[in-house]
Every structure is written in structure tokens, then in C-alpha cells.
């Protein structure tokens, strides 16, 4: 019996919506990354994108444990000399709450073209509304 290998054109992708209200950031991100990769499916193949689409709502209400709300620091570089910037978790939530979840999930995905394709299937919204009703997403309880 030959080993089954998924083919990109035959992969069936579902849409799921996840409510981040009160969920712990890391625990939410690990499950979302797992589903974006497709590791929850029996036909998972490492070199093929077999994952589903994930919509995350209420990103502004995501929780972190301990003192991370004030102590966790996000860094990025502008590209100019001395252009390192930093922001705490509180500042990030106030400015761009969806970016916090995007950064957490992106770090858990493979680096390279396949990982970027998986990351593009993630849709994050700060509030409770999203514009993907036409895809009829199923509610995913994490």
C-alpha cells in the first residue's frame, strides 16, 4: 500500500471563526497555527498546505497571564540606523490589537513560502464583526 500524499488541488478547506474574548494568547495561537497547517486532518502532508481558513474576532479582548500586559515588549526595526522601536503589550492592544495575535501565530508557522501561504489564511479582527459571512464559517471553540 502506497503512502497517501495530499495534492494542493484536492485539499478541502473549511472556514472557522474563533472568539478570542478571554482566551489566553499563547494557547489560542498554538491551536490556530495547528489548524492553519492542517495538522488536525488525517490527510496532513508536511510539504502541502492542507490547512483551513481561520477568522479570529474580538482580538482586543485576548488575555495574557502574569505581568505580561505591562512587561511583554514587542520590537521591530524601521530599517534605518538606530531605528529599533518597541511597544508593550498594552500599547499594541491599544493601537493595533489584531497585530498581537498575528505576531504570535506567525512565529508558530514554518518560515518560507509554505508558511507565508498558511499565514495568508488567517483573518484577524479587533471587534466582533467580520466580513466573511459569505464563506459560512463554522464556530470553533478553543
Swiss-Prot record:
Which PANTHER family does the annotation name? LARGE RIBOSOMAL SUBUNIT PROTEIN UL13M, RIBOSOMAL PROTEIN L13
What does UniProt list as this organism's lineage?
A: Bacteria, Pseudomonadati, Pseudomonadota, Gammaproteobacteria, Enterobacterales
Q: Which HAMAP family has this protein been placed in? A: Ribosomal_uL13 (MF_01366)
The alphabetized UniProt keywords are:
Ribonucleoprotein, Ribosomal protein
**GO cellular component assignments:** cytosolic large ribosomal subunit
The protein here is known as Large ribosomal subunit protein uL13
* Superkingdom in the source lineage: Bacteria
Q: Which PROSITE patterns match?
A: RIBOSOMAL_L13
Q: Name one Pfam family in it.
A: Ribosomal_L13
Q: Outline the subunit composition.
A: Part of the 50S ribosomal subunit.
Amino acid at each position: 500500500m502506497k503512502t497517501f500524499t495530499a495534492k494542493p488541488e484536492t485539499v478541502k478547506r473549511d472556514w472557522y471563526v474563533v472568539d478570542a474574548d478571554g482566551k489566553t494568547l499563547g494557547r489560542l495561537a498554538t491551536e490556530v497555527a495547528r489548524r492553519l497547517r492542517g495538522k488536525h486532518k488525517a490527510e496532513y502532508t508536511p510539504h502541502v498546505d492542507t490547512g483551513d481558513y481561520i477568522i479570529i474576532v474580538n482580538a482586543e479582548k485576548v488575555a495574557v497571564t502574569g505581568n505580561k500586559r505591562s512587561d511583554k515588549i514587542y520590537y521591530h526595526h524601521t530599517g534605518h540606523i538606530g531605528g529599533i522601536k518597541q511597544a508593550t503589550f498594552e500599547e499594541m492592544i491599544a493601537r493595533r490589537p489584531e497585530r498581537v495575535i498575528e505576531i504570535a501565530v506567525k512565529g508558530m508557522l514554518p518560515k518560507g513560502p509554505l508558511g507565508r501561504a498558511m499565514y495568508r489564511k488567517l483573518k484577524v479582527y479587533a471587534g466582533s464583526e467580520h466580513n466573511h459571512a459569505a464563506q459560512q464559517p463554522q464556530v470553533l471553540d478553543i
